[in-house]
């Protein structure tokens, strides 16, 4: 049995927005509200990033066309006592999917938490 950090990515559609900043704010608020309603305050919500195919630069995944925005969101959570990576993925999708019912969730990254001498778990810096 292992402990994992699972990062899921989710596309969030928002309406009646004019700029990508508006879309990001509305999307984060929408997701946080849905997660809090299900008492999932341990799930971290972050903006997704895309990579330019030409120059390789990273930019926020938020696009607005005709007052409708599409925002990529990363959802990070820790899964404890999973039997495998696949099991951790299923648990994470089930937990988050309970709050975001009609949002497709895709695994962006899964990392196993490392145990040091039985004294506890060490979380990589980018997950703190």
From Swiss-Prot:
<comment type="similarity">
    <text>Belongs to the UPF0212 family.</text>
</comment>
<dbReference type="Pfam" id="PF04475">
    <property type="entry name" value="DUF555"/>
</dbReference>
<protein>
    <recommendedName>
        <fullName>UPF0212 protein TGAM_1344</fullName>
    </recommendedName>
</protein>
<dbReference type="InterPro" id="IPR007564">
    <property type="entry name" value="UPF0212"/>
</dbReference>
């Amino acid at each position: 049995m292992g402990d994992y950090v699972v990062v899921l990515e989710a596309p969030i559609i928002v309406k009646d927005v004019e700029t990508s900043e508006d879309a990001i704010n509305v999307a984060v608020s929408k997701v946080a509200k849905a997660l809090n309603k299900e008492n999932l305050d341990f799930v971290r919500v972050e903006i997704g990033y895309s990579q330019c195919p030409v120059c390789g630069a990273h930019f926020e995944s938020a696009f607005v066309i005709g007052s409708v925005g599409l925002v990529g969101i990363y959802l990070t959570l820790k899964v404890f006592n999973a039997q495998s990576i696949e099991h951790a993925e299923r648990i994470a999708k089930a937990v988050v999917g309970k709050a975001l019912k009609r949002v497709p969730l895709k695994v962006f990254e899964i990392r196993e938490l490392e145990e040091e001498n039985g004294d506890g778990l060490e979380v990589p810096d980018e997950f703190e």
